[in-house]
């Protein structure tokens, strides 16, 4: 949502001015007001995510990887959203195992193949990634989640905003989600 965005911008501007590294955002001690924010501030959460990526704890895959991954049968494509979310729209070739069922259904995921994960925003696929990594799987989490993917596929102008820093958009082919 938009509530509190000004606070996050102030915090990030101060961090930039102070010369903090992105991985240090996780260590900021920010004011906590339960009615107005989560226990961990979104700035801290961004810092944790950046730290996980920097340390290699979390490996990501991106929108521009979609075409080469979806055609490659040497990987497992796994959507960990609820059945209802999956049925409202999903990427072609993805199997649906909700994260809440993952531990009980882990034997349905072929060992020895990298697992490419997606959920709605990234949290559940991160949790699934940790569960699978703990059981010997190599995992990659989709950056941005299905919400990002669906918005980009359904609004080409949005990708131009998302990649406004000079990326050649003609190199990106995006398949529409299955409905």
Residue ranges and their predicted role:
Residues 23-34, 38-75, 83-116, 120-171, ...:
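Rhodanese-like catalytic fold shared by cysteine-dependent sulfurtransferases
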Residues 1-25:
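C-terminal catalytic lobe of FAD-dependent flavoproteins
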């Amino acid at each position: 949502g938009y509530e509190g965005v000004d606070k996050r911008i102030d915090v990030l501007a101060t961090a930039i001015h102070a010369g903090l590294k992105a991985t240090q955002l996780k260590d900021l001690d920010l004011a906590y007001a339960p009615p107005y924010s989560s226990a961990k501030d979104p700035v801290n959460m961004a810092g944790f995510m950046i730290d996980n990526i920097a340390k290699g704890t979390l490996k990501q895959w991106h929108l521009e990887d979609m075409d080469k991954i979806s055609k490659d049968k040497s990987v497992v494509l796994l959507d960990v959203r609820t059945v209802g979310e999956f049925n409202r729209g999903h990427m072609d070739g993805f199997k649906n195992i909700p994260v809440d069922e993952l531990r009980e259904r882990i034997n349905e995921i072929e060992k020895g193949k990298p697992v490419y994960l997606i959920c709605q925003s990234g949290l559940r696929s991160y949790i699934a990634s940790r569960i699978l990594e703990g059981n010997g799987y190599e995992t990659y989490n989709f950056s941005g989640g299905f919400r990002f993917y669906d918005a980009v596929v359904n609004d080409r102008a949005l990708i131009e905003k998302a990649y406004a820093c000079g990326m050649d958009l003609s190199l990106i082919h995006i398949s529409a989600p299955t409905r």
